Design a protein with these regions (language model features):
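Intrinsically disordered, low-complexity regions enriched for glutamine and histidine
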Residues: 1-2, 271
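Sec-dependent signal peptide cleavage junction
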Residues: 25-31
Length: 305
C-alpha cells in the first residue's frame, strides 16, 4: 500500500512538473500570439494590424489581378506606400514586407482596392523567414538577377575600396514594372554578386527612377571625404532630381535633407548622369529633358546651374 502511494505521488509530481514547464516555456503560445487582425471597411478598403515581432509579412500575389494600393503605417505615421497585385482567386507566389526595423511598434496596413472576397486575406501570413532560393528552370545563373521581384536599368555603378557596386531599378513587390526602388548588389570581381538591402526607397517626392553615383573623394559636398553620392530622379506627377549619400561604403544611404536639388517645368526631366570635369573644376550633370539633353554644373553637388 505504501509503495502504491509513493508511486502515485511520484506520478502526480511529474505531471505537475510538466504542466509548470509548459506554463513557463518562453516559446509556448508565441506562434499563436503572432496575429493578423483584418478589418474590412467596405468599398475595397481594409485595415490589417500585424504583430511586429515577426520579421516579414508575406503577401500573396496573383499576376493577373489589378493592383491594390497599400499604406504601411507605424505608430500612426505612413512609412511606406506601394502597389501589389494581391491574390483574388489563386496564389502565384508571395512577396515579403520587411517588418524587422519596427520591433515594439504598432504596425498596420491600409489596403485599398482589394475586394473583401479576395483569397489574399486567408493566405497572407507572418514569418521569420522568406525562401528566395533560385529554383526556376530558365532563370539566369550567370547574369545578375535580384533574389526576388523585378529589375531593369542598372544605375549608379561605382567602384570604391575594392568593391564594385551595382544599383538597379527594382520592384520588390511583383514581377512587373512599378514601385521603383534602387536595388543594390556588391562584387569584388564583377561575376560573383552579393545581394544587399534596398539602397534607396520611394518617399513623399516619388518613386526612385534612374541615376548615377560618384565618389566624392575631396569632400566637395561636405558629407565626408570618400562619400558615395547617389543622384536619382524622384518621380510622381512631376519629375525632380534628388540626392542621397553613404558614409559606410554603400551599405546604407541617407537622403539629402534639402531634396530636390534640381527642378523643371518640363514633365520629362530625368536620369541624371554626374561626373567630375577637371578642366572647369566642377561637377557636371547630364539630364534628359523633354526631347533633348541639358547640362548643369556644380562646385559642391548641391547647387546646380
Amino acid at each position: 500500500m505504501k509503495q502504491q502511494t509513493k508511486r502515485l505521488l511520484k506520478s502526480l509530481c511529474m505531471a505537475v512538473g510538466i504542466i509548470l514547464l509548459s506554463a513557463v516555456d518562453p516559446l509556448a503560445g508565441y506562434a499563436a500570439e503572432r496575429t493578423i487582425d483584418i478589418k474590412h471597411l467596405g468599398e475595397g478598403q481594409s485595415i490589417v494590424r500585424v504583430d511586429a515581432r515577426a520579421k516579414y509579412l508575406l503577401l500573396p500575389v496573383e499576376e493577373s489581378s489589378p493592383e491594390s494600393k497599400l499604406y504601411m503605417i507605424v505608430d500612426n505615421d505612413v512609412v511606406r506606400t506601394f502597389n501589389v497585385r494581391l491574390a483574388v482567386n489563386k496564389v502565384d507566389y508571395f512577396v515579403p514586407v520587411d517588418l524587422s526595423g519596427y520591433a515594439d511598434k504598432h504596425i498596420s496596413f491600409n489596403f485599398q482596392l482589394a475586394p473583401e472576397s479576395a483569397l489574399c486575406w486567408k493566405e497572407m501570413k507572418l514569418s521569420d523567414q522568406f525562401d528566395s532560393s533560385n529554383r526556376e528552370k530558365f532563370r539566369p545563373a550567370y547574369h545578375f538577377s535580384p533574389a526576388w521581384g523585378w529589375m531593369n536599368d542598372p544605375n549608379g555603378m561605382v567602384y570604391k575600396d575594392g568593391e564594385y557596386h551595382l544599383f538597379y531599378q527594382y520592384n520588390p513587390y511583383g514581377s512587373m514594372w512599378g514601385n521603383m526602388h534602387w536595388g543594390h548588389a556588391i562584387s569584388k570581381d564583377l561575376i560573383h554578386w552579393e545581394h544587399q538591402p534596398v539602397a534607396i526607397a520611394p518617399d513623399a517626392l516619388g518613386t526612385i527612377f534612374s541615376g548615377s553615383c560618384v565618389v566624392d573623394k575631396d569632400n566637395t559636398a561636405g558629407f565626408g571625404a570618400g562619400a558615395i553620392v547617389a543622384f536619382y530622379t524622384s518621380a510622381s506627377d512631376r519629375q525632380v532630381q534628388s540626392m542621397a549619400y553613404s558614409l559606410d561604403n554603400g551599405r546604407t544611404f541617407k537622403k539629402y535633407d534639402r531634396n530636390p536639388i534640381l527642378t523643371s517645368t518640363q514633365r520629362d526631366f530625368r536620369d541624371p548622369k554626374v561626373f567630375w570635369h577637371k578642366e572647369s573644376n566642377k561637377w557636371i550633370m547630364v539630364l534628359a529633358v523633354g526631347q533633348e539633353m541639358q547640362l548643369y554644373s556644380s562646385p559642391n553637388l548641391k547647387d546646380w546651374t
